[in-house]
């Protein structure tokens, strides 16, 4: 699956060829077809892998963090960091999101993955509210939708060279403060 993410990050979804992936993964095309049945199955499984891998590095980012507001911020900032794993994931996610416009099967899978990410983010907002670290008047789901959409947009701008990594992270931190209200003293 890592090879599929690398190929998509390098060549895009439209550039994903089973032969190229087989070479990247050092396996036969027959083995890929055996496991994934077809290109669509491969893309669906790659999306699931991307989501699982993102969960891994977001969990790492909040490990040992006890302040609920900081947990939310670190969850979001972990999606915009200069590591091969995050860069590949972000590029592949953006490619899959763009492809979902034209692919209804992929659209449904991507929508479910997005709902899960948004729900996790909304729960982090609720935790910050329960801890007295966020304005109780804000809707956790609305905040989560806006912040996850912002992460995607900032990530695309950073990856395409329109923003520096530092500026993207600074803007995201500012958005968390704007959404949650001032941090209580």
Predicted regions and their residues:
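A ubiquitous short alpha-helical element
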Residues: 41-43, 75-82, 108-115
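Solvent-exposed, amphipathic alpha-helical segments
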Residues: 3-10, 57-61, 92, 96, ...
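Helix-turn-helix
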Residues: 3-41, 45
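Hydrophobic/aromatic-rich alpha-helical bundle segments in the mid-to-C-terminal region
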Residues: 107-111, 115, 129-179, 183-185
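Amphipathic alpha-helical segments used for helix-helix packing
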Residues: 71, 84-107
